[in-house]
Amino acid sequence: MNATHCILALQLFLMAVSGCYCHGTVIESLESLNNYFNSSGIDVEEKSLFLDIWRNWQKDGDMKILQSQIISFYLRLFEVLKDNQAISNNISVIESHLITTFFSNSKAKKDAFMSIAKFEVNNPQVQRQAFNELIRVVHQLLPESSLRKRKRSRC
């Protein structure tokens, strides 16, 4: 995956999420990163990392799921690029904006979110714990009305 594609997708994603209303510094940072990665070329504009999927999911109304995956991707990308002095300030501005808008300005929520992405799925202890918690996760995903029906049918 090309970093140029990532930055362009980020720019479009942020514009879509924020309804094209961003602080001037965020837009300036996005433009600066766009220039740094030369992400406005035809080879970049022809392809989409997220936007085609984004459009399809908007129809279904399950945007929060897709947003969380996209945000996770960008936060990991920022982690890789944070040591690049030429763009570190711009990345910091955009990361702060994402934390403010997606995580309700909670660093604790962001850290918890990122810790999930770092779990090693090949680790047997992680696997055991994950399967131990799976039933609770599945129950929380069920609509509340179907939970009530199940409780009544058991009586």
UniProtKB/Swiss-Prot annotation:
GO terms for molecular function: cytokine activity; type II interferon receptor binding. This is Interferon gamma. It is found in: Secreted. Type II interferon produced by immune cells such as T-cells and NK cells that plays crucial roles in antimicrobial, antiviral, and antitumor responses by activating effector immune cells and enhancing antigen presentation. Primarily signals through the JAK-STAT pathway after interaction with its receptor IFNGR1 to affect gene regulation. Upon IFNG binding, IFNGR1 intracellular domain opens out to allow association of downstream signaling components JAK2, JAK1 and STAT1, leading to STAT1 activation, nuclear translocation and transcription of IFNG-regulated genes. Disruption phenotype: Deletion mutant mice show no special developmental defects, and their immune system appear to develop normally. However, they show susceptibility to bacterial or viral infections such as vaccinia virus or Theiler's murine encephalomyelitis virus, despite normal cytotoxic and T-helper cell responses. Keywords: Antiviral defense, Cytokine, Glycoprotein, Growth regulation, Secreted, Signal. It holds the Pfam family IFN-gamma. InterPro entries: 4_helix_cytokine-like_core, Interferon_gamma. Glycans are attached at N38, N90. Residues 1-22 form the signal peptide. Released primarily from activated T lymphocytes. GO terms for cellular component: external side of plasma membrane; extracellular space. One of its GO terms (biological process) is regulation of DNA-templated transcription. Homodimer. Interacts with IFNGR1 (via extracellular domain); this interaction promotes IFNGR1 dimerization. Belongs to the type II (or gamma) interferon family. The keyword Secreted applies.
